[in-house]
Structures are given as C-alpha cells and as structure tokens.
Amino acid sequence: MMTTAMATTRVRLGSEQLLTSGMLKNKRVGIVSNPASIDAKFQHIVRVLAETPEVGLAAIFGPQHGFRADVQDNMIETAHASDPSRGVPVYSLYSETREPTAEMLKGLDALVVDLQDVGSRIYTFIYTMANCLRAGRKHGVPVIVTDRPNPIGGDTVSGPTLVKGFESFVGQFPIPMRHGMTIGELARFFNDTGGIGADLTVVPMEGWQRGMYYEDTGLPWVMPSPNVPTVESAVVYPGTVLFEGTNVSEGRGTTRPFELIGAPWVDAEALAEKLRTYDLPGVHFRPVVFEPTFQKHARQACGGCQIHVLDRREFRAVESAVAVLVEIRTQNPSAFQWRQPPYEYEHDKMPFDILAGSSQLRHQIEAGLPVRTIYYSWLQDHERFHIERQPFLLY
C-alpha cells in the first residue's frame, strides 16, 4: 500500500522554518492550532512559542473540534476559554465566531496559522484559515501560514468541483474534492483568486515533494481531527465523506472511520460481489459487518464493505465511493435516503449537494448514469484547475 520508500531525510516544516527565521522576534503573536500542530520531535507550536523569550504569545485560536480536538462531530461548537498555565485566551473559531474579531486581534503584530490539512475540499480547517485571512485584512494584522504536507500528495486532483451558489463552511472556493495542494499553497490561492488581499506570508517547507504521501515525509502523524486517525483515513476521505450526506454510516463510531461503509439493511456479500464487477483500480471492497458505538446506526450491526486501498497512485477515492453509494442505493431503494438539512449551518440546501459542491452528482446518480460516465464528467474541470492553481504552487 505504500507508494514510495520511506524518506531517508525528513521534511522540515514551515513552523520549524518560522521559529528559526527571527520573523517573530519582539512580536505579539496569535496562533491558530490544534494537537496536530507539532514538529518532528512532537513539540507543540504553542509550547515552543510560549518558551521563546523574544516572542510574546498573546492569544490561541482553535478550529473545528476545538484547540484540543476533543469534540467529535459537525455542528457541535466549542466555547471560548483560557489557558491558565500561560495566561492567554483560547478563542474558538467553530462557534458563533468563525472569523477572529477586532477585539480578539487587538494588539497582535501577527496571526500565525499552523494547521494540518487532509487534502479534501470539505475539510473545514482551510476555511478557518481563509477566515483568518479575511480578518487580518479587515483589522490590519499580517497573517503567517506555516506550511505542512498534504498527507495524500500534491499530484492528484479528483472529484467534482464546487459550483457557485453551493458555498458553505465545507466549501468556499471552486476547487475539486481532492485539490492536491498544501495549506500554504491554498492560502496563496484563496488570498488571490478569492480577492481577500490579506498581508500574507507563507513559510514553506524544506524537502517536500508533490509525490509524497505523509509516510514519506519522515514526520510523525498526529490525527488532525477525531475521525481522521490515520493516513489511510485521509486517503479514502475525499470520497467516503460523501456518505455524510446519506443515511448510510461512513464508519464514525468505529476504529476505521471513512474506511467502513454500511447500514443495518445492507447485504455485505451482495454489495461486495457487485462492486468487484466495476474493476476499479487500486482498491478491494471486502464485505464486513460492523457496529458503530455512536452516530448513525449506533449499537446496530451494519452490513457493508471496508475499502482496502491496494495502490494509492491508482486508487480513485471519489469514483470508488460513488460506486459504493450507487450500489447501496440500487440494492436498497426503499431504505436508502439522502440526508435532509440542516448540515453545517445550511438550512436549505441538501447536505449531499453541499458536500459534492453542487446538485449535479446527486442528479447523475438518481438518473442512473454509469459511474465511469460520472467520473469522466469531472475531467474538464480538473484540467482547468491544474492551470488555475499553477501560479500558487510552491513545490
């Protein structure tokens, strides 16, 4: 399943570059981070900043799931708090406040964003970053984004592209489901093409290459959110996250979120047998029965499949997930349902459409279009995006 040999020399993170650059000397700094904001020695950036005498740590900001990443699900907000050991406020940016306010930024010389993305359009951390850029522009605070690896690589672009009118907190910009960019590259892309215009500095990594998966970087993996515990979760996530828009479990409440897909009314053997006829590259669908401990179908035995990625470079996460969805819907027409609003604070649009970036994919599935035809319908947008993103790539 590994795509290349493990790195013999590790990638040097943007946060490590920042802390040795002197850029923060004699500055009052705010930091947007969570438990994955560590360096190669597992040192957290908040601790390092707090222990650096020439840097004044003045505020901490947390994204979705909280600064401690202890909150499980979507639309469960975290409250503002304080860090008694450091005497600084801890502001939640997944609450009634999504964008830092003037009061939160008061007195700051810079706002640093050090977040680990997972490589999918719908992951909210990149929009928390975008909101920080907007706040920095409004209130005259420079924003520094310390770059981190895209854990699923920077070469592949896949899945449907967000269409205007379907923006939400899981999609603010017209990018494909799997965008193949680092968080620093996305900052540059959003700031320019989104017309934000913040005073932005991206501190690049050293040694990262676009073909790398996270294991190739030589860096320790810390789960950026509760339901992306492993790199394997991140690899399948751009596709199987679509099941959040249905009444089928995406494996939350199990030890394999986004790899296990199913529901109490799914025949696991029949599903896997049919999926094998698709002959999709780089993947095996194994029939399983699992019991989620929470969320959809909690404490119920669910039939379904586990998605085993055999070759990451051949695997097509979104096409594979659409195939699973199509077959579950076809085999269980009376039981399968599209999830109804609200979802991520959108009260009118269908949750599946918000995730997919438009209503097109849902309509294609309902019309019975072949999965391969659906896949080919994305390719023109991918070609355009490759051209659009090129000026903003750092590696």
Q: Which stretches of residues belong to each language-model region?
A:
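Glycine-rich, charge-decorated loop segments at or immediately adjacent to ligand/cofactor-binding or catalytic sites
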Residues: 69-73, 144-166
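Glycine/threonine-rich flexible loop motifs
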Residues: 117-129
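Glycine-rich oxoanion-binding loops at beta->alpha junctions
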Residues: 73-108, 120
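N-terminal phosphate-binding or glycine-rich loops at protein starts, especially the Walker A/P-loop
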Residues: 9-55
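Conserved anion/nucleotide-ligand pocket segment
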Residues: 166-240
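Glycine-rich, aromatic-lined ligand/substrate-binding cores of catalytic
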Residues: 208-293
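Short internal beta-strands
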Residues: 56-65, 146
